[in-house]
Design a protein with these regions (language model features):
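N-terminal active-site beta-alpha-beta segment that forms phosphate/nucleotide-binding
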Residues: 1-45
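Conserved phosphate- and dinucleotide-binding cores of soluble alpha/beta proteins
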Residues: 27-223
Length: 223
């Protein structure tokens, strides 16, 4: 940002110290947050001009046409898993067990002009880039770019971004090749076995059914 004189107009989301520091250094014009992740962010709301609080409805309510997520140019998000259709899972682990909550992940992905997922290719012995995610939290039609430590992949639905990367000389590969690279390192995982019982339902932003989480079957070892 210093080298190219880049300044962000504003930033939203869960805020922590690094974003507060960017605001205080003049690299970000305004910070509007719906939750804080550390005390530096909490204190900044009271002490730093240009740091504002907003409600969850102002942040990402699908029925609110003025929601801030709909005004984002870019959003950078993480993932537990991402598959070759660019579907993202941030809810369940590779073992099918609930790990947390989606938060604003699907909202910011859908509302922004460009959604960038940043994640390592593998975690330990698990492939982050895979054939099919355990649970769809954010659908692939809302995800534009995947950035890993082994390469960048662009959703084929965004030929405009592919053209931009080509013009900038930024190399990129297919997401299928990243999946195969991950499997070549850690192996292809066995599918998680589930029972019929549904323990959680995932709704899309429009209220339609996106996916379900089922009770996992107890793991058994082969004799």
């Amino acid at each position: 940002m210093d080298e190219r004189g880049i300044k962000m107009g504003w930033a939203i989301g869960g805020i922590c110290k690094p974003m507060v520091e960017l605001l205080q250094k003049g690299k970000v014009g305004k910070v509007i947050d719906v939750q804080d992740f550390d005390l530096d962010a909490v204190n900044s709301i009271n002490q730093t001009p240009g740091h504002f609080e907003m409600s969850a409805s102002q942040y990402a309510n699908p029925a609110n046409k003025g929601a801030f997520v709909n005004k984002l140019d870019f959003v950078v998000l993480a993932a537990l898993e991402i598959d070759t259709d660019f579907n993202v899972n941030v809810l369940t682990g590779s073992d099918g067990v609930l790990r947390g909550a989606p938060g604003g992940h699907p909202d910011t992905a859908a509302g922004s002009k460009c959604c960038i997922i940043v994640t390592p290719l593998i975690r330990g012995r698990m492939a982050t880039v895979c054939e099919k995610v355990v649970t769809v939290t954010t659908p692939g039609d809302c995800v534009d770019v995947l950035v890993t430590d082994y390469g960048i992949a662009v959703n084929p639905r965004r030929p405009d971004l592919i053209e931009c990367l080509d013009k900038a000389g930024i190399p990129h590969v297919s997401i299928e090749s990243l999946k195969e690279k991950a499997y070549s390192i850690v192996g292809r995982p066995d599918e998680v076995q589930f029972e019929d019982q549904v323990v959680a339902v995932l709704e899309a932003r429009d209220g339609t059914l996106l996916d379900v989480v089922r009770k996992i079957k107890p793991y058994t070892f082969d004799d």
